């Protein structure tokens, strides 16, 4: 059975991805903060992995412990991040820097998955095709109009 780690698994998007991964018969690991709600993660087939992205040494220990027992993940979908905050520097700290810590740690521990998917936000594109509702494509230029995007 292939394994998948879904970070931000207790969030809106992450919890739906967890359910889909279970339907597709993956071994599912839900990467969450210790303070995260587990309300949508009650299925006994879900393995909980507490991850502290804010502290690289702690994150390294958590991932290293997993590797020692289960090896690496086949796939990782990274959707942990903040969508709202009072200080716009928090977006950079959490959504960029902590993601960098995560990827750097995976490399350092030789835990590179077959595929790593980073879930960002439509806010990156700003109001592209807002009136016509045309699909956003790779050719569209990002035009973020908020610190979040």
Residue ranges of predicted features:
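N-terminal Rossmann NAD(P)H-binding glycine-rich loop of SDR-like oxidoreductase domains
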Residues: 4-24
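N-terminal Rossmann-fold cofactor-binding loop
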Residues: 31-36, 52-53
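NAD(P)H-binding glycine-rich loop region in Rossmannoid oxidoreductase-like domains
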Residues: 46-97, 101, 126-127
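SDR active-site strand-loop-helix element
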Residues: 7, 31, 76-80, 116-122
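Conserved acidic residues
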Residues: 2, 72-74, 114
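Conserved Rossmann-fold NAD(P)-dependent oxidoreductase catalytic core, especially the SDR/UDP-sugar
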Residues: 100-146
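Short loop/helix-cap segments at secondary-structure boundaries that form the rim of catalytic
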Residues: 37-44
